Amino acid sequence: MGLGVLCLALVLLGVLQSQAQDSTQNLIPAPPLISVPLQPGFWTERFQGRWFVVGLAGNAVQKERQSRFTMYSTIYELQEDNSYNVTSILVRGQGCRYWIRTFVPSSRPGQFTLGNIHSYPQIQSYDVQVADTDYDQFAMVFFQKTSENKQYFKVTLYGRTKGLSDELKERFVSFAKSLGLKDNNIVFSVPTDQCIDN
């Protein structure tokens, strides 16, 4: 009996391992950055400040695993060199988690790369592009990274407040689908009052 249980455990381990590999091997290809919309006449000063993450879509997002996605906030703080210090504040367990990084301006206004990228040895490239914003209510930001030779991309729907209109959410879904994403790759966050307002 002990040998049978061991064989069953090994088979299950192999199945789980192959499923985990399949989830990253079947990534929807990232669109070329040049084909992603870029906010015309991007204003760095107006974009800074706090944004709440209302929606998230990406080739590594799976609705069935992330259906109870908790809202977090991201603060863009403009620096003298036109880079942003970017702080994301997330709820983790009973505490708050802070993720701080720098977005350095790229060749076109509204495009950025991850500063100090050598501090992230698993990341080969990381690009950020503001696709659409009115600065006062919403923004749609495209992120693309190459990590361990796999290309991931996501689109974030930001709101200056925790709630956005159904029309803006539908616009976000249409934008995500125009990049090749499916309904299963799109989630909306559950608002929280913990951590993210401070």
Curated annotation (Swiss-Prot):
GO terms for molecular function: enterobactin binding; identical protein binding; iron ion binding; iron ion sequestering activity; protease binding. It is found in: Secreted; Cytoplasmic granule lumen; Cytoplasmic vesicle lumen. The keyword Signal applies. Its main location: secreted. GO terms for biological process: acute-phase response; cellular response to amyloid-beta; cellular response to hydrogen peroxide; cellular response to hypoxia; cellular response to increased oxygen levels; cellular response to interleukin-1; cellular response to interleukin-6; cellular response to lipopolysaccharide. The modification Pyrrolidone carboxylic acid is found at residue 21. Disulfide bonds join 96-195. SUPFAM superfamilies: Lipocalins. Enterobactin binds at residues 126, 154. Detected in the ureteric bud in embryonic kidney (at protein level). Belongs to the calycin superfamily. Lipocalin family. Monomer. Homodimer; disulfide-linked. Heterodimer; disulfide-linked with MMP9. This is Neutrophil gelatinase-associated lipocalin. The gene is Lcn2.
